[in-house]
């Protein structure tokens, strides 16, 4: 960051934590107090979702390394119909490892939370196994992120069919961009699909990139101004589905389905 205090997003590489003995020390020295680690259930399932054998074991090693360096681990777990029973075992594992007690010893609290994640980008592929709200294990309800705001897809559709507003992807005062190694640029709140691409720094130039950002002139932002949530729910919603969504995640799911179709037309 330039001329301001750096922002910390509590994200770090667990791959590097277990391979670089200086990495945790570096994190501590720059003021990191909590690092989030992501599970997808038990060992085999977590390895498969992450795409690397041994990933689950590395997450547990990273947990130990963080604690040894005065940094609290925070566990999150993504839940779906396939892994719900495995995810239900994670609080027991945290208790077995005495993570709450050990975090208190370093002046922090241990946090574990569960959610289904958004349903855009790669997560769209998991829609068929998205968790049914009534199938969420009761033991996980206290850990479920914003459970009180969770709805079924049917409830989301019913609500949005009455909504004449457009999806709002206008820029706020603070804009964060993702820039790839080939200089393509996206907003950080989207996934990196062609529909959301702002442009290319080398091909389009900084002035044109800034114009597109300031004028909100990207394919996705233009399309958002042309359609209402009621239209999205009518075209793409499943009024019989009991899949669990927050209303915000469901709005994003519908709009991205629409974007994908419009972009391919």
Predicted regions mapped to residue ranges:
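Alpha-helix C-terminal capping segments
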Residues: 1-4, 134-136, 248
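Conserved SAM/AdoMet-binding glycine-rich loop
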Residues: 1-38
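A generic secondary-structure micro-motif detector
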Residues: 12-13, 52, 80, 209
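Short, charged, surface-exposed secondary-structure boundary motifs
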Residues: 21, 45-47
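Short, flexible coil/linker elements and helix-boundary hinge sites characteristic
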Residues: 21-22, 98, 236-237
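Alpha-helix boundary recognition
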Residues: 28, 67, 95, 211-214
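Radical SAM enzyme [4Fe-4S]-AdoMet core and its adjacent flexible, acidic
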Residues: 33-34, 40, 48-181, 186, ...
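Flexible mid-to-C-terminal extensions adjoining Fe-S/redox cofactors in radical SAM and related proteins
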Residues: 184-265
